[in-house]
Amino acid sequence: MKNKILRSVLMVLIWTFGSLTMLSAQGSYSNFNDLTDRLNQLNSNYGDLVSLESLDETADGREIWVLTIGSGDIENHPAVAVVGGAKGSHIFGSELALTFAEKLLARSNTDEVSELLETTTFYVFPRLNPDATEHYFADLKYERDVNTISTNEDRDDAFDEDPFEDLNGDNLITMMRVEDETGKWKMLEEDNRLMTQADITKGEQGNYHVFTEGMDNDKDGAFNEDGEGGVNINKNFTFDYPYFEPGAGENMASQIETRAILDFLFEEASNVFSVVTFGPANNLSSPLRFNRGAVSQRVITGWYEEDVAVNSLVSEAYNEITNLDYAPANSGQQGDLFQWAYFHYGRFSFSTPGWAVPEVMDEEGNSQKFESTDAKFLVWAEQQGMDAFVDWQEVNHPDFPNKTVEVGGIKPYVSFNPPYSAVDSLAESHTDFLIKLAGMKPNVQLVNFETEEAGRNLTRISVDVHNSGILPTAARLGERTNWVKEVILKLELSGNLELVSGDVLETIESIEGDGSLTQTWLVRGNGSFTISAGAPNTGISTIEQTIR
């Protein structure tokens, strides 16, 4: 017995050390090979708690991974889907999803997490758009959100004929400004390194044109409008799909990456009660507001009031744990995963960028106010000793003879991806939040069970179907769709038991948090019976009894 206990302790230490080694050895954001190695190590170290599956391969042959975490009957345990990397340039979201999985499993030897994983499943999609994200590691850096599928963005029947060019030779694609009296742009007064559009209503006048760095290769008057690839996966989902918009694809759900997650969630993950996206949308730092007009239309475009209340509750928990209440609100964009998860998948959908530029203090310790978020970022970056800006440099440009053309601007990626040194602490707090969210899950229990003799060989059976969770068993919008399974209450009789009154099967659309409903049946005879209640996204509770 002592040897068995010792072996168990050693195993816990090995697993924990392995996870800590993964975290401490990592010194920079993970490219696809690093990400795959870390996932395989989790699969090897925690084989009884995880399974690693490739949903498909991208155009460049990269796997679209999903890591399932949990124990026992995982398909019938309420689940949280955690998604990173839908926006290709937001590499922090991908890193956050992966590091969450590592930190959660590193805690699996604690009572809190061990018990959680016995009743809750996590589906982690660490990098939904790996081909786009991989460009972060390319020699020539530019913010890329699209995959590598060739597209004809300018509809001229030529593909990828007008890409970016590195005009100043720094291996970064930034911005280009051209001095011209007819321009619509001017220097920002708050920080003259930055450019802003002139506001004619305020009497402002522009004196620059602003483009992304490059040349007009196809001579159509537009710059870099048809570069390499592709489709932005975070604009390719089915809700509010932006037809004909650059990067959205030829049609909704047209991409391997999009279909991979849609097929998995619809076909294999009916137990999901919430989707958490690490991306640009943000309804966690600031919850959404109820808009009665948006829910009164034939096509609903806003959250129901009951669901907004849930959003506020979860947001309060998020801010208490992460202290990110200062992060800007963002209700999402057309065709994104965040909105799809609520409006078309019918689940509670939460999203956060996971990081935002903190408050900037002056020399006296007072918070500085900024009109421009970019100006705020540059002051903060300088305080951190970051090299975040390419100074404007004059270049010769064949498309603008006799004009002053300069290249410069904020470096790619740095304004919305934190320094890697911040990842560990941010992942720690977001792991705490996801554990908290999982603990709020709907949880159907059969309670207050009673049998009572009713005379003449009759027995009255009564039970309360109770949702002991904080969240309702379904979002209000989920009640309107066919994609969220309703709670099923079922009575099964055996022996010579005969049902006199009541229904052997009932469906319940939703039970609010800490809510209950009572069900009674009248049966004749004796024998055994089974009562079960629940759904994959609420857990299933069962009572077995015999009437003699």
Explain the meaning of each model-derived region.
Residues 9-21:
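Bacterial N-terminal signal peptides
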